[in-house]
Every structure is written in structure tokens, then in C-alpha cells.
């Protein structure tokens, strides 16, 4: 440990100044003026160290910055390595010959300049001083004594670095180099290495580190990254206007509905005039319908005139539920208002016009039944229901081509037999009209069965 004081150049067993061991080997009293900055703390006494050279006269101890007016104070406690012992004498040098002693450990308080870029709250108090020029480093040059590595330029990066920068781009919150903690050592703290200026804006939290240390990056404020993106003339707004007139019924500029539902456009393809998906929506269509009937599928009830075609709110034809041909022309409205029934789908629309003679009994039968009174007995309704099914089966029999061994033949025969059993279960109730209607229906089914049997031979 060195016993010399930077201010007095004397050993520790005497006064702190006034004695100097010159190169001649004798004690030459030299009166040095008192130091400009007195020591802040007393130093513990240290054992005297002989400064005599081992091979003769002692070598001079060269103090960096001594002739340039250096006024710093170097407290004892730092290790001074013996650089060389060649020639019988040794010369002590500081571990980093390019730096002044007051540059490393200075007693001057460092007041950071207020910068225009605010540091994040989690990084305040960690010796991270931000400056308006975008560089991080010591707050002011080290002093007039240190002329070797004077840090004057704002964008100056020293030619040598003492840390290993990884070649990969670090993460947003990854510490640079080999620092142990992720957040406490973003910049190397100025107690450790104050002269090293990191890459400019390279390791600010939230920005990836630059691969080139000397390249300056433009600083964009947080949350405003796309301000520098050039706007393409007049193509941005017409494109939005083109999307605004979309076919999905959104009249607003953006396609998704906001908290207040937007009114659908007049040319909407997927909006119905009777009901809209949003209940509180005010639609600008000309005459809104009175209370809608909530159709099962909005696409089926798009045409307002097609809603009254059937009771089931399907746009299918009413002829699916009535007998084909002349029956629909004569009393289709009467049947539809009195009888509610279901039947197989109509497969052949032109088959009824080929055999009009077979439909004459069925045409007269409903008229005779309904001419008596509006309150049709249930037995008559059941007979009419059976006759409607027989109409479709008769069409199937007319189209049948095959033999008795075919499955189609078995199916038609079984269906006709089932309708005969339905007619047998009808109770007449002592009424001649019901008995007559049932008899005619049974005769018709038997005639169809005979026709089917002849075709199957």
C-alpha cells in the first residue's frame, strides 16, 4: 500500500507535506503550498515503505497530470502494481496509465444535467444520467489535468472498451455484457466505469441495442413510432371510403360495430327489412314493418312479399302442401284454410295433367264435404288427409317401371296398404256422407294397387 499522499509527497511518519525524497538520495526539504482541497477524511496510519531503489538511486515516481495543474485528491487504499523492475530499480505506475487519478475517484459531487428524455421510474436512482444530445457518459470533462482521454464530444465513443458486447441483439430488459442483475446495471454504473460511453440510444430501455457502436439511432418517443412513416398522398382516405360502402350493412367507416350500433346502409345485402340483428337499431329503410314475426332464418324472409306465401315462414310454394293440378285451382284456398296437414314433397309437377279422369272423384269429394257446414267432422278430415297421400302414391305408380321383386314395388305396395288401414280406422258415426267418402277412397286405393300389380308383371 502506498504511503505517499497526493497532496504532500511525504511518508506517513511525519507531517503530511514539506518533505520529499529526491533522486539524489538525501532528504531535501521542499515547502509545498497546502492543498487546494483538504482531505475529506483522515487516513489510518500506514507502515513506512522504503522508496530506495534496490540497485542504487531510486527511480522517480511519475505522477500523471502532475505538471498540468492537476488538483485532484487520490485517497490511499488503491493498489499500485509494480510495473517493471528492470535495471535494478522499480517504477510504480497506475493500473490504467491513460487516466488521471482524479478522473477515476473524484470527490466532487456530480450533479446530473436535466435531460429532455425522462428516465423510466424503475431506472431512476441507478446513476443513469440522460442528456439532451442522446449520449450517456460523465456529466462533464474530467479536468484540465487529464488530456489523454478527455471526453469532450457528445457522440464520441472511446476506441477501446472494457466489456464484451454480445453480437446478438439483447432483449428489451436484458442487461448489457456480463452484468449480474437484469435491471440494476443497465448502463455500467459510473462507480465502475465512468469513462465508457455506451452506444448512443442503443441500450435505452425499450430499444434494442445497436450493432454498430458508432452509429446514432433516431429517437422516437414512446407510443409514436409511426409518425415518421410517410403518408401516401391521397390514397389513404379514398381506400377507407371505398371500404365504407361495403355490402355487410355497416355504414360506419370501420367494419366492426362500436358501442352505439351504426345504421345499416340502404343497399345492404344481409339486412332484412323486417328484423335487424341489433334490436335498438334505427334502420333507414322506407316503410319499416309493424311488429315483425321473428323469422327462423333472416335469409329466408328477405323478400317481404314472400313472407305471406306459407304459414311456416319458408319461401317455398304453397303447392307443396296441397294436391297438384286442378285441385289447387278449384279449392286450394279452401283446403289451406280448413286443413292443416303435412305430406311428402311433390316430386313430379306435370304428372297430374296426364290423367285428369282419375282426379274427378277427389275434386268433387272435398266440395261435397265442405258445402254442408264449416265445422267439418274429424272423420272427414282424416279421409281427406289419406286422399292427399294417395295422390302422391298414384303419381309414383304411374312412373314405376320394374318388377315385383324391386324394392320400389314393395315400397309402393306397402304405402298403399297402410293408407287402406287408415281408412278402415275411420269411424262413420252413423253419417252416410262419411261412409260414402270412405268407400270412394277405398275403391280408389284398390284401383291404384291393381294398376301397380299389372306394371309389376
Swiss-Prot record:
<dbReference type="GO" id="GO:0045785">
    <property type="term" value="P:positive regulation of cell adhesion"/>
</dbReference>
<dbReference type="GO" id="GO:1903215">
    <property type="term" value="P:negative regulation of protein targeting to mitochondrion"/>
</dbReference>
<dbReference type="GO" id="GO:2001145">
    <property type="term" value="P:negative regulation of phosphatidylinositol-3,4,5-trisphosphate 5-phosphatase activity"/>
</dbReference>
<keyword id="KW-0143">Chaperone</keyword>
<dbReference type="InterPro" id="IPR036533">
    <property type="entry name" value="BAG_dom_sf"/>
</dbReference>
<feature type="compositionally biased region" description="Low complexity">
    <location>
        <begin position="1"/>
        <end position="20"/>
    </location>
</feature>
<dbReference type="InterPro" id="IPR039773">
    <property type="entry name" value="BAG_chaperone_regulator"/>
</dbReference>
<feature type="region of interest" description="Disordered">
    <location>
        <begin position="128"/>
        <end position="335"/>
    </location>
</feature>
<keyword id="KW-0963">Cytoplasm</keyword>
<feature type="compositionally biased region" description="Low complexity">
    <location>
        <begin position="255"/>
        <end position="268"/>
    </location>
</feature>
<feature type="domain" description="BAG">
    <location>
        <begin position="379"/>
        <end position="456"/>
    </location>
</feature>
<dbReference type="GO" id="GO:0051087">
    <property type="term" value="F:protein-folding chaperone binding"/>
</dbReference>
<dbReference type="GO" id="GO:0072659">
    <property type="term" value="P:protein localization to plasma membrane"/>
</dbReference>
<comment type="subunit">
    <text>Binds to the ATPase domain of HSP/HSC70 chaperones. Binds to the death domain of TNFRSF12. Binds to the death domain of TNFRSF1A in the absence of TNF and thereby prevents binding of adapter molecules such as TRADD or TRAF2. Interacts with PRKN.</text>
</comment>
<dbReference type="GO" id="GO:0005886">
    <property type="term" value="C:plasma membrane"/>
</dbReference>
<feature type="compositionally biased region" description="Polar residues">
    <location>
        <begin position="326"/>
        <end position="335"/>
    </location>
</feature>
<dbReference type="GO" id="GO:0071364">
    <property type="term" value="P:cellular response to epidermal growth factor stimulus"/>
</dbReference>
<dbReference type="GO" id="GO:0097178">
    <property type="term" value="P:ruffle assembly"/>
</dbReference>
<feature type="compositionally biased region" description="Pro residues">
    <location>
        <begin position="31"/>
        <end position="48"/>
    </location>
</feature>
<dbReference type="GO" id="GO:0051897">
    <property type="term" value="P:positive regulation of phosphatidylinositol 3-kinase/protein kinase B signal transduction"/>
</dbReference>
<feature type="region of interest" description="Disordered">
    <location>
        <begin position="348"/>
        <end position="374"/>
    </location>
</feature>
<dbReference type="GO" id="GO:0030838">
    <property type="term" value="P:positive regulation of actin filament polymerization"/>
</dbReference>
<feature type="modified residue" description="Phosphoserine">
    <location>
        <position position="7"/>
    </location>
</feature>
<feature type="modified residue" description="Omega-N-methylarginine">
    <location>
        <position position="41"/>
    </location>
</feature>
<feature type="modified residue" description="Omega-N-methylarginine">
    <location>
        <position position="54"/>
    </location>
</feature>
<keyword id="KW-0597">Phosphoprotein</keyword>
<dbReference type="GO" id="GO:0071356">
    <property type="term" value="P:cellular response to tumor necrosis factor"/>
</dbReference>
<dbReference type="InterPro" id="IPR003103">
    <property type="entry name" value="BAG_domain"/>
</dbReference>
<dbReference type="GO" id="GO:0051496">
    <property type="term" value="P:positive regulation of stress fiber assembly"/>
</dbReference>
<protein>
    <recommendedName>
        <fullName>BAG family molecular chaperone regulator 4</fullName>
    </recommendedName>
</protein>
<comment type="function">
    <text>Inhibits the chaperone activity of HSP70/HSC70 by promoting substrate release. Prevents constitutive TNFRSF1A signaling. Negative regulator of PRKN translocation to damaged mitochondria.</text>
</comment>
<feature type="compositionally biased region" description="Polar residues">
    <location>
        <begin position="348"/>
        <end position="365"/>
    </location>
</feature>
<feature type="region of interest" description="Disordered">
    <location>
        <begin position="1"/>
        <end position="104"/>
    </location>
</feature>
<dbReference type="GO" id="GO:0010763">
    <property type="term" value="P:positive regulation of fibroblast migration"/>
</dbReference>
<feature type="compositionally biased region" description="Polar residues">
    <location>
        <begin position="160"/>
        <end position="193"/>
    </location>
</feature>
<feature type="compositionally biased region" description="Pro residues">
    <location>
        <begin position="284"/>
        <end position="295"/>
    </location>
</feature>
<feature type="modified residue" description="Omega-N-methylarginine">
    <location>
        <position position="185"/>
    </location>
</feature>
<dbReference type="GO" id="GO:0090367">
    <property type="term" value="P:negative regulation of mRNA modification"/>
</dbReference>
<dbReference type="GO" id="GO:0031625">
    <property type="term" value="F:ubiquitin protein ligase binding"/>
</dbReference>
<dbReference type="GO" id="GO:0005634">
    <property type="term" value="C:nucleus"/>
</dbReference>
<dbReference type="GO" id="GO:0033138">
    <property type="term" value="P:positive regulation of peptidyl-serine phosphorylation"/>
</dbReference>
<feature type="modified residue" description="Omega-N-methylarginine">
    <location>
        <position position="108"/>
    </location>
</feature>
Amino acid at each position: 500500500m502506498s504511503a505517499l499522499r497526493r497532496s504532500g509527497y511525504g511518508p506517513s511518519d511525519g507531517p503530511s507535506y514539506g518533505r520529499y525524497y529526491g533522486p539524489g538520495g538525501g532528504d531535501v526539504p521542499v515547502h509545498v503550498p497546502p492543498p487546494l482541497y483538504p482531505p475529506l477524511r483522515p487516513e489510518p496510519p500506514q507502515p513506512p515503505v522504503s522508496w530506495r531503489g534496490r540497485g542504487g538511486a531510486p527511480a522517480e515516481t511519475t505522477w500523471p497530470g502532475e505538471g498540468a495543474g492537476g488538483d485532484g485528491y487520490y485517497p490511499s487504499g488503491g493498489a499500485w502494481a509494480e510495473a517493471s523492475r528492470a535495471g535494478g530499480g522499480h517504477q510504480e505506475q497506475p493500473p490504467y496509465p491513460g487516466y488521471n487519478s482524479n478522473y477515476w475517484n473524484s470527490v466532487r459531487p456530480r450533479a446530473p444535467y436535466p435531460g429532455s428524455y425522462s428516465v423510466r421510474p424503475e431506472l431512476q436512482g441507478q446513476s443513469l444520467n440522460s442528456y439532451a444530445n442522446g449520449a450517456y457518459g460523465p456529466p462533464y470533462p474530467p479536468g484540465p489535468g487529464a488530456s489523454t482521454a478527455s471526453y469532450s464530444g457528445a457522440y464520441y465513443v472511446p476506441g477501446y472498451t472494457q466489456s464484451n458486447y454480445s453480437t446478438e441483439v439483447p432483449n428489451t430488459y436484458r442487461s448489457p455484457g456480463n452484468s449480474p442483475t437484469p435491471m440494476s446495471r443497465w448502463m455500467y454504473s459510473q462507480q465502475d466505469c465512468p469513462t465508457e460511453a455506451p452506444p448512443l440510444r442503443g441500450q435505452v430501455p425499450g430499444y434494442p441495442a445497436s450493432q454498430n457502436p458508432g452509429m446514432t439511432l433516431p429517437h422516437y418517443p414512446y407510443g409514436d413510432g409511426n409518425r415518421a412513416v410517410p403518408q401516401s398522398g391521397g390514397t389513404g382516405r379514398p381506400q377507407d371510403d371505398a371500404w365504407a360502402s361495403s355490402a355487410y350493412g355497416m355504414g360506419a367507416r370501420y367494419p366492426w360495430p362500436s358501442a352505439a350500433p351504426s345504421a345499416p346502409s340502404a343497399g345492404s345485402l344481409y339486412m332484412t327489412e323486417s328484423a335487424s340483428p341489433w334490436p335498438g337499431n334505427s334502420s333507414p329503410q322506407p316503410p319499416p314493418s309493424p311488429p315483425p314475426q321473428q323469422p327462423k332464418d333472416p335469409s329466408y324472409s328477405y323478400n317481404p312479399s314472400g313472407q305471406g306465401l306459407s304459414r311456416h315462414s319458408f319461401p317455398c310454394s304453397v303447392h307443396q302442401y296441397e294436391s297438384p293440378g286442378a285441385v289447387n285451382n278449384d279449392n286450394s284456398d279452401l283446403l289451406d284454410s280448413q286443413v292443416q296437414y303435412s305430406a311428402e314433397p311433390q316430386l313430379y309437377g306435370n304428372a297430374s295433367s296426364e290423367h285428369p279422369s282419375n282426379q274427378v272423384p277427389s275434386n268433387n269429394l272435398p266440395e261435397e264435404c265442405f258445402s254442408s257446414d264449416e265445422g267439418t267432422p274429424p272423420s272427414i278430415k282424416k279421409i281427406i288427409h289419406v286422399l292427399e297421400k294417395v295422390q302422391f302414391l298414384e303419381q309414383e305408380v304411374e312412373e314405376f317401371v320394374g318388377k315385383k321383386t324391386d324394392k320400389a314395388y314393395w315400397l309402393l305396395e306397402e304405402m298403399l296398404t297402410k293408407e287402406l288401414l287408415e281408412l278402415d280406422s275411420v269411424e262413420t258415426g252413423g253419417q252416410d256422407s262419411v261412409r260414402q267418402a270412405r268407400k270412394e277412397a277405398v275403391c280408389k286405393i284398390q284401383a291404384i294397387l291393381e294398376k301397380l300389380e299389372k306394371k309389376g308383371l
